[in-house]
Amino acid sequence: MSWVLHIAFQIQVEHPVSELISGVDLIREQILVAAGEALSVAQEDILFRGHAIECRINAEDPIRGFLPCPGTITHLHLPGGNGVRIDTAIYEGYQIPPNYDSMLVKVITYDRDRKTAIRKMIRALDEMEIEGVRTNLEFQYDILHQKDFQEGNFTTDFISTHYEL
């Protein structure tokens, strides 16, 4: 019998959520360790505070089975403000090829509790404008308005039980 062990040395995609609730810059810590330095914070000193939510805005069409939507971004307005973090590399004129990772923008909001973080995310998505390609922006916005989502009553079956796609 053979065994294969896979070790991935990358940070999780959701690391901004962990960073916001812990106050620890995980990328900085990863670089320090890679450079042979010690971590700047001890595990027992990390305290979790508040609530963070991440929405991934993708160039895809939820109504058509989340098919990819390549094209050119013709207009872009990203939200901002206290407790709103935007991770992206897109810009007006950005070309999305057909063979790509569909994630365009990660929007992360942080506040004292889930309800307030959701409200902040709703405002952020309401302010966001991406034109030229189809995205899942409106779909994410709709999910945030679902009572079950707001109350934390969801599983990995949420989309299939709340939407006919």
Roles of regions detected by a PLM:
Residues M1-L165:
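ATP-dependent carboxylate activation and anion-phosphoryl transfer catalytic cores
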